[in-house]
């Protein structure tokens, strides 16, 4: 559907400039979309690999925890893990990836007391299985934190890809076709007006020549 504009040469010039800008913008956005997709696929691959590793390691920790719960009373087990020995602080920064502000988490881990022991309990009334579960969870934590960062980055990039896709489609299927159709319409009207003007001038010339001939 063409735009509702006056078919003048000035309007034609404006529309041609708009078409050039829209075409250039479409190419830039399409390039951005392609690069975002390339990076997104890489992030998804990394996310899947991390999640697979984390789930596998968590499974081992949960098995140890279940074995510990079989030989320890629920009350004492809950008390043993109620007060974690490690504190974690997060410093959040941002990294710009193709106009996407991806969070970069800097985690600081600190063990409290007991010369850095990771166990929040004494060993007298606990089982080796509980020790194993705590050790595994402690070792998994860096991957869990990295997984959180990667998953958030994937989510933000997916949102940006969708926004870019909508803008590309709007230019490709609406704005550019409308401009092209309107330009063709104005050009056609200008050509018609020019032919009409030429025909009218030729008639006037013919009438003047005929008049001069009759006067002689």
Curated annotation (Swiss-Prot):
GO terms for molecular function: ATP binding; proton-transporting ATP synthase activity, rotational mechanism; proton-transporting ATPase activity, rotational mechanism. Pfam families: ATP-synt_D. One of its GO terms (biological process) is proton motive force-driven plasma membrane ATP synthesis. InterPro entries: V_ATPase_D. Keywords: ATP synthesis, Hydrogen ion transport, Ion transport, Transport. HAMAP family: ATP_synth_D_arch. PANTHER family: V-TYPE ATP SYNTHASE SUBUNIT D. Produces ATP from ADP in the presence of a proton gradient across the membrane. Belongs to the V-ATPase D subunit family. This is V-type ATP synthase subunit D.
